[in-house]
Amino acid sequence: MSRYRGPRFKKIRRLGALPGLTSKRPRAGSDLRNQSRSGKKSQYRIRLEEKQKLRFHYGLTERQLLKYVRIAGKAKGSTGQVLLQLLEMRLDNILFRLGMALTIPQARQLVNHGHILVNGRIVDIPSYRCKPRDIITVKDEQNSRTLVQNLLDSSAPEELPKHLTLHTFQYEGLVNQIIDRKCVGLKINELLVVEYYSRQT
């Protein structure tokens, strides 16, 4: 299954705010109206919607998300929390959280087009897993820096999560540590996502 490229507002109206997909927000009360039209949600649908929320926010295919769930299931600790850490530490998401891109698809384009370096080397793989002490910089070329500066100027000022530091004038971000669960930028019940996949096998 490919990445979603359809109308974004349609998705947030059904699933709620997806900041990685779009900065738009659902209208107040739209969730209640949708729920009243469709009646009480089944447990399956609740789990499915949480899974879809995660997939659309991070811009993943179904196969990619399943792969992350399997990796998280083999790791030590809570599968749900490990899953969120894996997704949050992707390079495209780190750029988004730093404010160098307005959405994760936009961050993915920056990476794909070779504008981003990690520890001094160009990385063109959006799924690259960042680690503590990684230094993310914009390529030292005018078109790359102008592009990112425009995005930084356009992004709404938000407090950075504790695991990241941004040096705006150096076009540089630093990964301080693995993200803490409370700093995840999406309202999600990750346990329902894990439960969804456990019932598919």
Swiss-Prot record:
Pfam families: Ribosomal_S4, S4. Disulfide bonds: none annotated. It comes from the Eukaryota. Gene3D superfamilies: Ribosomal Protein S4 Delta 41, Chain A, domain 1, RNA-binding S4 domain. Residues 20-44 are annotated as: Disordered. Its main location: plastid. It is found in: Plastid, Chloroplast. GO terms for molecular function: rRNA binding; structural constituent of ribosome. PROSITE patterns: RIBOSOMAL_S4, S4. One of its GO terms (cellular component) is chloroplast. Keywords: Chloroplast, Plastid, Ribonucleoprotein, Ribosomal protein, RNA-binding, rRNA-binding. Residues 89-152 form the S4 RNA-binding domain. One of its GO terms (biological process) is translation. CDD domains: S4 (cd00165). Belongs to the universal ribosomal protein uS4 family. NCBIfam families: PRK05327.1, rpsD_bact. PANTHER family: 30S 40S RIBOSOMAL PROTEIN, SMALL RIBOSOMAL SUBUNIT PROTEIN US4M. One of the primary rRNA binding proteins, it binds directly to 16S rRNA where it nucleates assembly of the body of the 30S subunit. Part of the 30S ribosomal subunit. Contacts protein S5. The interaction surface between S4 and S5 is involved in control of translational fidelity. This is Small ribosomal subunit protein uS4c. It comes from Aethionema cordifolium.
